[in-house]
């Protein structure tokens, strides 16, 4: 009988423990640009939406997508992890890392590997709204089809690009 009561208490305690972390799901959107670290130099524009699930008070993981524009438009799909360096308060520094693959909707391009570690700070505003500012390093691989035509000949080749850049992003988390 004692074993049955103990097992029932364990099952009843589980919802109590999970109830201690408020708002387990968060959604964030960011826009950003970067400083290219290689040639050919391209200043990208990036917009991302990420959904996170809080695994603890300071660590969350989720998935994201968005739109990145380099020479061609890319749609990244990535896994994302985020760790807050201090306990939750008005201003909190954090580390974040996204890794995945970017797809190219254009038939003249192929996407590639995507990796984006960053460090940032979040500032809690009214209610659940939080502002985000981050600086990171982004790696984006891309393959595009280049065509050249003149009156004498026509050429077509695939060019593999490896973008490495320092990224700056501003966003909102709800």
Which residues does each predicted region cover?
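Outer-membrane beta-barrel pore domains and translocons
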Residues: 30-36, 66-68, 84, 98-102, ...
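Gram-negative (and chloroplast) outer-membrane scaffold detector with strong preference
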Residues: 41, 45-131
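Extracellular/periplasm-exposed beta-strand and loop segments of Gram-negative cell-envelope proteins
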Residues: 38, 70, 103-110, 142-149, ...
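A contiguous, mid-protein "functional segment" used to position or interact
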Residues: 130-132, 136-139, 145-150
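Bacterial Sec-dependent N-terminal signal peptides
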Residues: 1-25, 170, 174
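Outer-membrane beta-barrel initiation region
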Residues: 20-29, 36-43
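Outer-membrane beta-barrel "beta-signal"
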Residues: 81, 160-174
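Polar/charged side chains located within well-ordered beta-strands of beta-rich proteins
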Residues: 27-29, 49-51, 137, 164
């Amino acid at each position: 009988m004692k074993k049955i009561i103990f097992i029932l208490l364990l099952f009843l305690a589980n919802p109590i423990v999970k109830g201690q972390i408020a708002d387990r799901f968060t959604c964030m959107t960011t826009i950003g640009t970067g400083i290219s670290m290689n040639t050919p130099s391209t200043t990208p524009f990036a917009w991302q939406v990420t959904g996170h699930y809080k695994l603890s008070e300071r660590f969350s993981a989720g998935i994201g997508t968005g739109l990145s524009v380099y020479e061609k438009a890319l749609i990244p799909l990535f896994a994302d992890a985020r760790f807050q360096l201090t306990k939750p308060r008005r201003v909190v520094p954090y580390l974040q890392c996204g890794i995945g693959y970017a797809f190219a909707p254009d038939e003249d391009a192929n996407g590639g590997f995507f990796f984006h570690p960053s460090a940032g700070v979040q500032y809690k505003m009214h209610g659940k709204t939080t502002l985000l500012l981050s600086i990171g390093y982004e790696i984006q691989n891309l393959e595009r089809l280049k065509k050249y035509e003149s009156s004498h000949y026509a050429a077509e080749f695939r060019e593999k690009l490896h973008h490495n850049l320092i990224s700056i992003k501003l966003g909102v988390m709800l």
